[in-house]
């Protein structure tokens, strides 16, 4: 573990800026997420989200979760519960609102190649006059909740914040499932995992970050997701106004294409820390925290009335319950997730029973630290090493 203080980070940032000065195209930039309108309602399939997260990493989806997802257990909700964080991106001639996902490596979008019935409510990608279709290339993604998308591949111009590339692989959807069509706030996904897991065939393509990182002052991006508010992505630099204390760094394991790392333990509420560390993935594209069964059971033993519900497809409890904090130990740093973040959402409209933000990883062998965890942290994803940095949000 390496701990960088704000002062050290500033000195490193200054030295980087000096060494980069001869190359005027190198830069750093911030891109803000967009909040959904407060009066916009939509349907969220909670067990479907859970199933998709498990399947994304090759996990087994329990039968109870499959059945709950197929029944469409849902809550109609405005922009709360932080199910997705959307960011404006210019793709070709279109500005789209995309889900930035550190757990995948594809940039796929709704396009004008979709049937008209699947286009309604979405902003669409239209290839620019300079776009090149990659003949014989295709992509096809399926998730555990039954959702899927597939289509063609183009080489086109993509702009995020202050950085543009005219040679980014853009995966244009020509077929898409109803689960995605119904989410009219979301026009696609921008993957920020390692390019080794890009799904384009016959040859994998590079992520946007890998394509543009040579233009940045430093080959990194930092994430500040927020609770009940839009968050921020910083590319190429670390903003010391967004965190308190020091950034604790740990080696990232990219062997499976994800931003993986090893923790050094955990604690629940005011209890003492367990020294049993676990392997984890930092994933902005997963909503929940998915942990080993023994940790999940230990957590909900501290929640009055909590139970694992077959019907709901996960742990539930009374919405009025005060939940204990959950802390992940990384070196000498303790990343605290407030209990209120773990009270994720009612299991259905008007219900007094809520769905937990911590659920089982179903024997996956890896824990997934999704948005419920990340929105309490300022997290640095540095491709040099690679390494991950964690600090409490300011």
UniProtKB/Swiss-Prot annotation:
The lineage of its organism: Eukaryota, Fungi, Dikarya, Ascomycota, Pezizomycotina. GO terms for molecular function: aspartic-type endopeptidase activity. It catalyses: Hydrolysis of proteins with broad specificity. Generally favors hydrophobic residues in P1 and P1', but also accepts Lys in P1, which leads to activation of trypsinogen. Does not clot milk. Residues 1-20 form the signal peptide. Its main location: secreted. It is found in: Secreted. InterPro entries: Aspartic_peptidase_A1, Aspartic_peptidase_AS, Aspergillopepsin-like_cat_dom, PEPTIDASE_A1, Peptidase_aspartic_dom_sf. This is Aspergillopepsin-1. Disulfide bonds join 319-354. Its EC number is 3.4.23.18. SUPFAM superfamilies: Acid proteases. It comes from the Eukaryota. Residues 85-391 form the Peptidase A1 domain. Belongs to the peptidase A1 family. Secreted aspartic endopeptidase that allows assimilation of proteinaceous substrates. The scissile peptide bond is attacked by a nucleophilic water molecule activated by two aspartic residues in the active site. Shows a broad primary substrate specificity. Favors hydrophobic residues at the P1 and P1' positions, but also accepts a lysine residue in the P1 position, leading to the activation of trypsinogen and chymotrypsinogen A. Residues 21-69 form a propeptide. Monomer.
